[in-house]
Swiss-Prot record:
Residues 1-63 are annotated as: Domain I. It comes from Streptomyces griseus subsp. griseus (strain JCM 4626 / CBS 651.72 / NBRC 13350 / KCC S-0626 / ISP 5235). The RuvA-RuvB-RuvC complex processes Holliday junction (HJ) DNA during genetic recombination and DNA repair, while the RuvA-RuvB complex plays an important role in the rescue of blocked DNA replication forks via replication fork reversal (RFR). RuvA specifically binds to HJ cruciform DNA, conferring on it an open structure. The RuvB hexamer acts as an ATP-dependent pump, pulling dsDNA into and through the RuvAB complex. HJ branch migration allows RuvC to scan DNA until it finds its consensus sequence, where it cleaves and resolves the cruciform DNA. SUPFAM superfamilies: DNA helicase RuvA subunit, C-terminal domain (SSF46929), Nucleic acid-binding proteins (SSF50249), RuvA domain 2-like (SSF47781). GO terms for molecular function: ATP binding; four-way junction DNA binding; four-way junction helicase activity. The gene is ruvA. The lineage of its organism: Bacteria, Bacillati, Actinomycetota, Actinomycetes, Kitasatosporales. This is Holliday junction branch migration complex subunit RuvA.
Length: 208
């Protein structure tokens, strides 16, 4: 198992960071939130989980060990693979997921792209005794999904700047996709940050 990778960031993409380790570039799949804290040329340390398939080896990266642990625990539920587990962490923090499961908050889970009503009900049953209670004292005050719902602009802008775009370009791209985010909030769901990032990049590519 590769527990973590540490080294300078060689490259950043919308879903991937390349970390140079001993002269080798390790491609690591990350959420937009994790990517937003990385900068090309700067040192980084990512907790990692290696997913082995017959035709691929995929390394998933996380800001800390807690995110990695939750990522791996989520996959113990039937129907949850690494991509869905990562999507859940892109939408909610580890503690927000723990709170959602411990309180039976079906709405919080359906805010994740790829999880419907029946899927959420099944996950609540299967994960109830696996994730445990929230470990952060602040979670009860901030509520489930609050960081993603209210902070999607900051996440998106930081991710775009991390990819090498100027602040002005990032601001314009964020404003361009704002209606999509606001529509999600109006429906009571968290803005889909990964999809918003892709849409923002498409906007920037068209402008060039």
């Amino acid at each position: 198992m590769i527990a973590f990778v540490s080294g300078p960031v060689a490259a950043l993409a919308p879903t991937t960071a390349v970390i140079e380790v001993g002269g080798i570039g390790m491609a690591v799949q990350c959420t937009p939130h994790t990517l937003a804290d990385l900068r090309v040329g700067r040192e980084a340390r990512l907790a990692t989980s290696l997913v082995v398939r017959e035709d691929s080896l995929t390394l998933y990266g996380f800001a800390n060990d807690d995110e990695r642990q939750v990522f791996e625990l989520l996959q113990t539920a039937s129907g949850v693979g690494p991509r869905l587990a990562q999507a859940m962490l892109a939408t909610h923090s580890p503690d927000a997921l723990r709170l959602a499961v411990s309180t039976g908050d079906e709405k919080a889970l359906t805010a994740v792209s790829g999880i419907g009503k029946k899927g959420a009900q099944k996950l609540l049953l299967e994960l109830k005794d696996r994730l445990g209670e929230p470990v952060g004292a602040h979670i009860g005050q901030q509520g489930i999904g609050t960081p993603v719902t209210s902070g999607w602009r900051d996440q998106l802008q930081a991710a775009l700047i991390g990819l090498g775009y100027a602040s002005r370009e990032a601001d314009e791209a964020v404003n361009a996709v704002a209606p999509q985010a606001e529509a999600a909030v109006a429906e009571g769901t968290a803005p889909p940050v990964p999809q918003l990032l892709r849409a923002a990049l498409q906007t920037l590519n068209r402008a060039r």
